[in-house]
Amino acid sequence: MADFVGSWKLEHSENMDGVWKALGVPSDMVDKARNEKPEFTFELEGNKMTIKMVSSLKTKTTTFTFGEEFKDETFDNRTVMSTVTKDSENKITQVQKGPEHTTHIVREVTGDKMVITITVGDVKAVNTLRKM
């Protein structure tokens, strides 16, 4: 899990528009978010992880215990119930359950690169982050 710890910057995004559309995110919010290059900080303390995302649109901090469901707020202000599990030392999976959609977010670290795969139904987006 130590590979996650540190600061990361979005380098490339593929098909986030498709995921946002599948989630019903308002088009004005999509237009604002489309060109953002947020920075992320991952911290780990025992079985708890904190993920902080900073962009010009929003700063969001999420702290969770692996394997325990928690109330979460998405970037577009939807309330969901999330559970994050450790798949391996360099891979975690988050499942967000909302009233209308279930979103799967897989984060996997290889070296100085993190690939985040977001799936809503049959729509998939891939974000690539680079360690700073």
Curated annotation (Swiss-Prot):
Positions bearing N-acetylalanine: 2
Keywords, sorted A to Z: Acetylation, Lipid-binding, Transport
Highest taxon of the lineage: Eukaryota
Cross-referenced InterPro entries: Calycin, Fatty_acid-bd, ILBP
Gene3D superfamilies named among the record's database cross-references: 2.40.128.20
Matching Pfam families: Lipocalin_7
CDD domains reported in the protein's UniProt record: FABP
MF annotations from Gene Ontology: lipid binding
Family: Belongs to the calycin superfamily. Fatty-acid binding protein (FABP) family.
Protein's name in the database: Fatty acid-binding protein type 2
Organism encoding this protein: Fasciola hepatica (Liver fluke)
